[in-house]
Amino acid sequence: MLKTTLLFFVTALCEIIGCFLPWLWIKRGASVWWLLPAAASLALFVWLLTLHPAASGRVYAAYGGVYVCTALLWLRVVDGVRLTVYDWSGALIALCGMLIIVVGWGRT
């Protein structure tokens, strides 16, 4: 379970970075060269999703829970926004959903 969660976390970071760098280019006028590491990050994101031993749709559904938490961590650390009780509550619910799906992988 821990290995799966850590893999999802790294996967989420790759997806967020791969989307954040073009956002910097479009919204903040960063160099177009940031699109190269963005593309590499998104390619790594896709590859990491293939490392799970479940059907793709089930992996994407479970990954979503960790993505929500990682995005909120990004919101706090990178964007400097203080998390609310609603953020924390949503993250907890998302992680519970991920846990239920992952535990069920071996039972279907």
UniProtKB/Swiss-Prot annotation:
A Gene Ontology cellular-component term: plasma membrane
> On the Periplasmic side, which residues?
1-5, 52-60, 106-108
Membrane topology type: Multi-pass membrane protein
Q: Which residues lie on this side of the membrane: Cytoplasmic?
A: 27-30, 82-84
Task: Give yes or no: UniProt keyword Cell membrane.
Answer: yes
| UniProt keyword annotations, A-Z | Cell inner membrane, Cell membrane, Membrane, Transmembrane, Transmembrane helix
The subcellular location is: Cell inner membrane
Name listed for the protein in its UniProt record: UPF0060 membrane protein YnfA
**Predominant localisation class:** membrane
Membrane-crossing segments per the record? 6-26, 31-51, 61-81, 85-105
Q: Which family does it belong to?
A: Belongs to the UPF0060 family.
